[in-house]
Regions:
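Bacterial Sec-dependent N-terminal signal peptides
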Residues: 1-24
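Low-complexity, acidic/polar, glycine-enriched regions of mature
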Residues: 22-185
Length: 185
């Protein structure tokens, strides 16, 4: 009797955890690209090591990007980006925590393309700002989801100072693209 009760208690504890684990999607190789265009110079950087977790049942979503993982065409650009602008030793990550908001009545578990809004807090360079951006989520038949989002980011909004010497080479607003392929964890 005691063994049966112990088994039942264990099963009741583990069953919700198994169900929750089945609902969790994630990746460790998402991609964030940013682009700066000025008459003086175009700058592109890519980070292909973005970690993200998405819970379709609640809409909760999180991203974490190591700043030093952004790669530039020129090594000198990468060095200045990490040391002078982003201070990546002091602020090693950019983090987003928020929620996916499907359009009214849309079911993200249904295969197809879904227009959504993503709302939450973006923390970068020690500054947190609340943002809301449109995004697209494409659900595959196997339950995987491709998520894409384009947004604009102003470095000054996050306390990132651009020295006057290079100000003409860096746009006031950066174009940021997020591309994530979520799979079941």
């Amino acid at each position: 009797m005691r063994t049966a009760r112990h088994f039942l208690n264990t099963a009741l504890f583990i069953f919700p955890l198994v169900l929750a684990a089945q609902d969790k999607l994630g990746t460790r190789d998402g991609e964030i690209t940013f682009f700066s265009s000025t008459p003086m110079e175009d700058i592109t950087a890519v980070n292909s090591k973005v970690a993200s977790v998405f819970l379709p049942s609640t809409g909760a979503i999180e991203f974490s990007a190591l700043i030093k993982a952004f790669e530039f065409r020129k090594a000198m650009m990468q060095e200045h980006f990490n040391e002078d602008y982003m201070e990546s030793d002091k602020f090693p990550k950019a983090i987003f925590k928020g929620k996916v908001l499907p359009t009214s009545g849309d079911d993200l578990s249904r295969p197809g393309v879904h227009a959504v809004s993503v709302e939450g807090d973006l923390t970068m360079h020690g500054v947190t700002r609340h943002i809301t951006v449109p995004a697209t989520m494409t659900t595959a038949g196997d339950g995987g989801i491709q998520a894409t989002c384009d947004l604009k980011v102003k470095p000054e909004d996050y306390g990132i100072k651009v020295p006057s010497v290079v100000r003409e080479k860096i746009a006031e607003t950066l174009d940021v693209k997020v591309r994530i392929a979520f799979t079941k964890l």
